[in-house]
Amino acid sequence: MNDIQNDQEPSAQESGTDMGKTEVPAVPSKQNDDHQSNKLPLLFALNFSILMASKPMVMLAKAISFLHTLLKKRPRCPYTLYVVVMAMVDAAAVLFIQWSMYEEPTYADPDAVDGTTKMFNSVAGQLTKFVAQMWMEHNYVWLLNFLVLGMVYLVLVFVLNRFWVATALFSILTSIYAVANSIKVDLRNEPIIPSDLGFLSSGNGGEITSFIPKDSQPLVNGTITMLIWLTIICLALQLIDGRRCVIPFHWWHPFRNVKTIIGNCTRIIAVVLSVSLLWSFTWNLGINGSWSYKWAKSLGDNPLLWSTVVDATYNGPTVGFLRLAHAKTMDKPKDYNKETMEALAKRYKESAQATNEARANNLTDSTVVMILSESFSDPTRVPGVELTEDPMPNIHALEGTTTSGLMLSPGIGGGTANIEHQALTGLSLALFDNSMQSPYQELVPHQKTPYTFNQIWNDAYGKNGSVAFHPYFKNMYLRDSNYKKFGFSKLYSLDSDPAIEHQDHIDSSPYVSDAASYQNVLDSINSNDHTQFIQLVTMQNHAPYNDFYADNQFKEADVSQLSDEEKQSIDNYAKGISLTDQETADFLNQLNAVDKPVTVIFYGDHLPGTYSTATKDKNNTLVMHETDYFIWSNQASASAGVKLDPQTAGYVSSNYFMALAAEHMNAKVSPYLEMLTQVQAQIPAISRLISSNDSWGDGSTAYLDAEGNRVKRKDLSKEAKQLLNDYRLVQYDMSKGKGYLNDDGFFAVK
């Protein structure tokens, strides 16, 4: 049995030998894999222990421990140091930004200028005066800019809660602003304004470096180097400063104890208050009568909205920038909505269609020249002024043969751009909020596609359908950028490229003559095969009214019982008006020789600010706001010799000019022009009158009837009130609303 058993069950050794001989592959064991994987963490731990026990790692651990101990013992910077550093950095930022507005003066003959004058006129001298005027003139605009930038600094400190990081960021932001401002002033004689930020948000930020001129590159490079070192220093100070946070704050355990709760609440309150203060100041600075407006005025702020560069130079670029950041346009009408605007558009479309059926011509059949004649008005209409010679006999004669009358102006001695804006857009300053003082600076920069009447010619003839001339500097009232938005192909000015061609002066006048201005218009008319809209803003009669002209007959013709100083200004002004009168007559005669239909809309924007005696009398309020205007067509026009009824055209405001011109020309109108025509028939003139001389139009609203009498709003007819409400709805939609009318054909002439 044993033998049999041995034969059947070979020994393990024999079996193993036999299997080896047959080369059967071994099957992997799962238990072996698990065993190997369990060894890996042990091996890693063993190797890590060996590594950490090595001499270099022991030394590194000791160094880290030493640094940790050192950092735990680092001193906390006192809050007084923060205050001192903030004051120094803030003051430096104000000076750097203000420096960006100045440039070293050049002299035709340096030897003829004394050293003291050179010192005061230098950049250092101007900066010194900007600060020293606090003591010399009690003007605290430097302090105002210091406090405003301090608000920005505080916001960064409380939001980031890291003093030195906030200091670095504040320095970077203000330095970039100062350098960019300096470059823009050099290139365009215009500071950085809020609308410039749209260039960045539109995705063009990468192109900014292409605008840096070569001579500004050292400034850019030097500023970058300074900021790099300043950032390194600030980060090092943040590391060294034992006060990690300006205000103790804990995210993960906000309610750990009373101290933590107090710290967290303090931080939140500080952020909310600082942001709210800066936001409220910025939001209200441009609103006349607001708390920030009054506070800024008390510190010497004097808004100079006619020129952003002058405003920034005098009041500081920071204040000038924030002033334009927000302006209250107008309150939303209660019934403003899409349905209301669609119904309104439909109503005036039907009315325009009925009007157009009776009219034979189109506006674009003629070239229309809109002339804003600077400060043009009749001196003999001013109470107390007595001249023995008529300073404007040609225009007086013309007014008897063509559409003409008196225009109600919102300004005296200023506000040119407001009257111009009304004439080009049909919008009324009186319907805007009273805090809106200059739409060219406070409204248009924030609009994407503002509507203006020159676009009627652009629709007919493309980009070259309209052109503008202004024989002065292009950035006055931001005309250069605004005219581009309006669709003018070019604004020719003294500093445009190319510059306005004809720049002749009369005698010692510092301004281009009206004759030269008119010649630029004539050249444009003669060089174009198609009609166009031409905008001209003259300069000949701009203040000051010094003794510029030879042979001034009005020195003898003035028999007014006024002071010698006032009479002298009036006499010089009257001489300029008499020259404009003759130059305008010559211009119209030249247009009569042109074999193309041309219609001229001519108006004075406001009376000069020379009539101090007459302005003091409140009974003269209306007459001091009335200037002459006329609408005239040359012999080649179908409307030559047309004179609208004085009941229609005797008293107007500039927002109605294009509607009146269409009526004068018997031209078809858009629904928008139809609405303006109807409003003008019920309310011939509407204007926000100024409250003081040399003001912009920040007083009460005046409504005139066809005889020029002032009418209270409550006494307007029911129809007039309805039309005024329609006007308000349309103006809101065009300036601040949803733009429902843009896609509704409301501005198209069909």
Indicate where each model-derived feature is located.
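N-terminal targeting leaders characterized by basic, low-complexity, disordered sequences
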Residues: 1-54
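Transmembrane and membrane-interface helices of multi-pass
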Residues: 38-308
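Serine-centered coil/turn micro-motif
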Residues: 47, 54, 290, 312, ...
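Short hydrophobic "helix-edge" motifs at membrane interfaces and signal-peptide entry regions
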Residues: 135, 363-365, 594-596
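A diffuse structural propensity rather than consistent per-protein peaks
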Residues: 181-196, 334-337, 493, 513, ...
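Alpha-helix initiation and N-capping motif
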Residues: 197-200, 314-318, 338-341, 392, ...
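Membrane-interface segments at or immediately adjacent to transmembrane helices
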Residues: 282-370
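Solvent-exposed soluble domains appended to multi-pass membrane proteins
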Residues: 356-359, 372-373, 378-750
